[in-house]
């Protein structure tokens, strides 16, 4: 499997920026004796994104994004679909932490019916994703360990609620994550 993508942004005045992107993916399933249908899910995907960021003030920024993706699988039934995404986020750059809150919706429309689940019915799902992330520089807590404040701890919570026209695809998930990241300059 592989994925390629490109994107960029441009500013409009001092408080607005527009971002855009394209990604291509070619995913390959690992077909073996325990998964004899993996080859059928091999898919080519194209996705496009467009976003707008706005600086409200030194503390608050907002972002709105739209996306479209099209996935075409080797075997169509239940694997070919289009996704339409829309999300809104608000970010707070507090002196003590960076907090990002985002709420988004994804609409999935499948192109052919999956006969293994429901004959003749085209699957259609909507998923609501809410997440909150808190980021803090380790150097703010332990200056001796990270004097440049380039090592971060990230805590996040995500809730996904999906509803489909086929009951098998309704679900609610909650997830928490803890991660560490480091920033550096290449010049």
What are these regions (language model features)?
Residues 1-187:
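Gram-negative and organellar
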């Amino acid at each position: 499997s592989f994925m390629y993508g490109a994107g960029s942004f441009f500013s409009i005045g001092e408080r607005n920026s527009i971002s855009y992107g394209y990604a291509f993916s070619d995913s390959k399933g690992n077909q073996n004796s325990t998964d004899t249908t993996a080859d059928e899910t091999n898919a080519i995907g194209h996705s496009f994104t467009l976003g707008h960021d706005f600086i409200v003030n030194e503390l608050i920024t907002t972002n709105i994004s739209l996306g479209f993706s099209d996935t075409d699988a080797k075997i169509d039934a239940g694997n070919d679909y289009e996704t339409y995404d829309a999300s809104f986020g608000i970010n707070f750059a507090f002196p003590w932490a960076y907090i990002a809150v985002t709420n988004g919706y994804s609409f999935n429309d499948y192109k052919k019916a999956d006969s293994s689940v429901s004959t003749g019915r085209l699957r259609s799902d909507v998923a609501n994703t809410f997440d909150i992330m808190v980021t803090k520089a380790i150097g703010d807590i332990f200056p001796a360990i990270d004097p440049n404040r380039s090592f971060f701890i990230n805590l996040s919570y995500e809730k996904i609620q999906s509803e489909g026209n086929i009951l098998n695809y309704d679900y609610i998930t909650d997830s928490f994550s803890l991660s560490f990241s480091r920033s550096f300059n290449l010049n």
